Each structure stands twice: as structure tokens, then as C-alpha cells.
Curated annotation (Swiss-Prot):
Several genes are coding for Mu-theraphotoxin-Hhn1b for which the structure by NMR has been determined. The cross-references to PDB can be found in entry AC D2Y232. It comes from Cyriopagopus hainanus (Chinese bird spider). Residues 22-49 form a propeptide. Residues 1-21 form the signal peptide. This is Mu-theraphotoxin-Hhn1b 2. It is found in: Secreted. The keyword DNA-binding does not apply.
Length: 86
């Protein structure tokens, strides 16, 4: 009885660890994919703007995102995104 309870708990612990690792990898993959899709190509700058538009790469310490469009530089992803709730 004790052995079967121990095996059941060990199995549940193992299932939790596997699910957590899978979810963590999935989040990292989606963040990398989003960052690569929205990455700024330095070779094709085109016209210089006073501020950066949505999805443009930015530096959080020097936020150059367009304030008139309610954009802020995301510290986590390092691209301009809409500021929600302001």
C-alpha cells in the first residue's frame, strides 16, 4: 500500500515537471518567434522618423517609441508596443 502510494505521488511529480518544462519551452519559443518576426533590419532603414512605430526594435533605457500613439518600449521583448490601461 505504501509503495503504491509512493509510486503514484512520484508519477504525479514527474508529470508536473514534464508539463512545466513543456510550457516553459513553448513560451520561450513564442517569444523568440515574435521577436524575430518584428526585428528591425538595420540595412533597410528608409526614412528616419522622430519616433519608432509599433513593432519596431527599441532600447528601454532610451524609449523612442511614438508617445502620440500610446506606444512604449517593452523591457521584456525590446520592441514598441501599445500601452494598455492608460
Amino acid at each position: 500500500m505504501k509503495a503504491s502510494m509512493f509510486l503514484a505521488l512520484a508519477g504525479l511529480d514527474l508529470l508536473f515537471v514534464v508539463c512545466y518544462a513543456s510550457e516553459s519551452e513553448e513560451k520561450e519559443f513564442s517569444n523568440e518567434l515574435l521577436s524575430s518576426v518584428l526585428a528591425v533590419d538595420d540595412n533597410s532603414k528608409g526614412e528616419e522618423r522622430e519616433c519608432l512605430g509599433f513593432g519596431k526594435g527599441c532600447n528601454p533605457s532610451n524609449d523612442q517609441c511614438c508617445k502620440s500613439s500610446n506606444l512604449v518600449c517593452s523591457r521584456k521583448h525590446r520592441w514598441c508596443k501599445y500601452e494598455i490601461g492608460k
